[in-house]
């Protein structure tokens, strides 16, 4: 199991806001090892973990993380970005959607935002808390956010003590450039 640098930064953001998490409905997409979702569950949130329905190994990694962290009751569902599936339709409204480094391949960006848009219609006040590793100055979400009627706030890493090369005595996030984003519906769409 590998923990990506962005997962540690998102977990730090969750830890900084841990007092607001109990009872919140939280979905982690592209969860993998599920560090942010596991932490949210440990802080009292009602968490659902998800990864690609096309990659059963990834779903098994989510389940293993739950077992290793004494959270066998957490629901793990297969979701494929951009596809409306029965599992996606069955999800209850969420308060927060977690996404650690899901904006990895530009060809997936719109499918991710389409899935988020669908979930936002279940609860227009839901927020996407996402960490993003800058891999190319040419990649941007701005046009797609506008297209999907969403807005984005960049959260300074120093505002939640994540502006270091190591967090929680780990070597992560290292020297990677990571951004913390909070994405929601644009104001005029509410």
Swiss-Prot record:
Subcellular location per UniProt equals: Nucleus; Cytoplasm
Function noted in UniProt: Histone methyltransferase that dimethylates histone H3 at 'Arg-17', forming asymmetric dimethylarginine (H3R17me2a), leading to activate transcription via chromatin remodeling. Maternal factor involved in epigenetic chromatin reprogramming of the paternal genome in the zygote: mediates H3R17me2a, promoting histone H3.3 incorporation in the male pronucleus, leading to TET3 recruitment and subsequent DNA demethylation.
Primary location class: nucleus
Pfam family name, one? Methyltransf_16
Subunit annotation: Interacts with HSPA5, HSP90B1, TUBULIN, UGGT1 and UGGT2. Interacts with TET3. Interacts with STPG4.
GO MF annotations, alphabetized? DNA-binding transcription factor binding; heat shock protein binding; histone H3R17 methyltransferase activity; protein-arginine omega-N asymmetric methyltransferase activity
Which gene specifies this protein's sequence?
METTL23
CDD domains linked to this entry? AdoMet_MTases
Identify which top EC class this enzyme belongs to: transferase
One term under GO cellular component? nucleus
EC number(s) given by UniProt: 2.1.1.319
Q: Which disease is it linked to?
A: Intellectual developmental disorder, autosomal recessive 44: A disorder characterized by significantly below average general intellectual functioning associated with impairments in adaptive behavior and manifested during the developmental period. MRT44 manifestations include mild to severe cognitive impairment, delayed psychomotor development, seizures in some patients, and dysmorphic features.
**GO process annotations (BP):** cognition; epigenetic programing of male pronucleus; epigenetic programming in the zygotic pronuclei; epigenetic regulation of gene expression; methylation; positive regulation of transcription by RNA polymerase II
* InterPro entries referenced in this protein's UniProt entry, alphabetically: Methyltransf_16, SAM-dependent_MTases_sf
List UniProt keywords, sorted A-Z: Chromatin regulator, Cytoplasm, Developmental protein, Disease variant, Intellectual disability, Methyltransferase, Nucleus, S-adenosyl-L-methionine, Transferase
The entry assigns this protein to a family as follows: Belongs to the methyltransferase superfamily. METTL23 family.
What catalytic activity does the UniProt entry give for this protein? L-arginyl-[protein] + 2 S-adenosyl-L-methionine = N(omega),N(omega)-dimethyl-L-arginyl-[protein] + 2 S-adenosyl-L-homocysteine + 2 H(+)
Q: What is this protein called?
A: Histone-arginine methyltransferase METTL23
């Amino acid at each position: 199991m590998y923990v990506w640098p962005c997962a540690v930064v998102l977990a730090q953001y969750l830890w900084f806001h841990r007092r607001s998490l109990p009872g919140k409905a939280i979905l982690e997409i592209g969860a993998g090892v599920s560090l942010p979702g596991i932490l949210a569950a440990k802080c009292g949130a009602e968490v659902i973990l998800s990864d690609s329905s096309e990659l059963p190994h990834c779903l098994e990694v989510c389940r293993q993380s739950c077992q290793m962290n004494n959270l066998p009751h957490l629901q793990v569902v297969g979701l494929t970005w951009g596809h409306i599936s029965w599992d996606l339709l069955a999800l209850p409204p969420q308060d927060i959607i977690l996404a650690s480094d899901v904006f990895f391949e530009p060809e997936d960006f719109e499918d991710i935002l389409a899935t988020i848009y669908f979930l936002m219609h279940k609860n227009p006040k839901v927020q996407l808390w996402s960490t993003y590793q800058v891999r190319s100055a040419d990649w941007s979400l701005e046009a797609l956010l506008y297209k999907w009627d969403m807005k984005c706030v960049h959260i300074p890493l120093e505002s939640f003590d994540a502006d270091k090369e190591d967090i929680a005595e780990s070597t992560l996030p290292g020297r990677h450039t990571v951004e913390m984003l909070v994405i929601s519906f644009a104001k005029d769409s509410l």
